[in-house]
Amino acid sequence: MINHFKPALLMLLVWTLITGVFYPVLVTHLGQLLFPRQANGSLIEKDGKVLGSELIGQPFGDPRYFWGRPSATAPHAYNAGASSGSNQGPTNPALLAAIKSRVQALRNADPGNTAPVPVDLVTASGSGLDPHISPAAAAYQAARVARLRNLSLPVVEDLVKRYTEGRQFGFLGEPRVNVLKLNLALDALR
C-alpha cells in the first residue's frame, strides 16, 4: 500500500519545492536584478525620505494640491492591506449619497467652478488605491490649485500636460495623471 503513496508524496514534495521555494526565489532575484525600482514598490524619495509610491494613491486634503480618486479602503484611506472596491452597485443609496457628498466637497472647495465634475473625482477605482486621475479631473482642479498657490493658470495647466502619461504601450487604457508626481512638481515650483 505504501508503494502506491510513494510517487504521490514524492511529486507533492518536488512540486512544493519548485512552486513554493525555487520559483519564488528565482522571480524575486530576477525582479531585483532587472527591475530593482519597481520590485521595491516604485518608491519616490526626496533627501533619503520616502514620500510615497507612484503605484498607490495618497490622500491630499489640502485644496492647494490636486486631489486623487476617493479611496474605497475604509476606515483608513489608501490602505493597501484593505484593497478592494466598494462593491456598491450604481443604484445603491449609500453610493449615491457618497457621490453627492464628494461633489459637494469639490464645489465647496472651488465655488466658482461650474463645470461638470469628472466621474473619477467622485467614484473609487476597483482597487480603491488608484494613484491616477484623468486629465479632465486634473483640468477641473487646475484653477483652484493655481489660485490658492498664487500661480498663473497656464503654468499649472502646463504642469498637468507635462505629467500626463499616455496610454500604456500606446493603446492600453486612457491617458492619466499621477497625482503624487504632479503634487510634488507643484511643490518644486516654489
UniProtKB/Swiss-Prot annotation:
The keyword ATP-binding applies. It is a single-pass membrane protein. Keywords: ATP-binding, Cell inner membrane, Cell membrane, Ion transport, Membrane, Nucleotide-binding, Potassium, Potassium transport, Transmembrane, Transmembrane helix, Transport. It comes from the Bacteria. It is found in: Cell inner membrane. The chain crosses the membrane at residues 7-27. One of its GO terms (molecular function) is P-type potassium transmembrane transporter activity. GO terms for cellular component: plasma membrane. Part of the high-affinity ATP-driven potassium transport (or Kdp) system, which catalyzes the hydrolysis of ATP coupled with the electrogenic transport of potassium into the cytoplasm. This subunit acts as a catalytic chaperone that increases the ATP-binding affinity of the ATP-hydrolyzing subunit KdpB by the formation of a transient KdpB/KdpC/ATP ternary complex. The system is composed of three essential subunits: KdpA, KdpB and KdpC. Belongs to the KdpC family. PANTHER family: POTASSIUM-TRANSPORTING ATPASE C CHAIN (PTHR30042), POTASSIUM-TRANSPORTING ATPASE KDPC SUBUNIT (PTHR30042:SF2). This is Potassium-transporting ATPase KdpC subunit. The lineage of its organism: Bacteria, Pseudomonadati, Pseudomonadota, Gammaproteobacteria, Methylococcales.
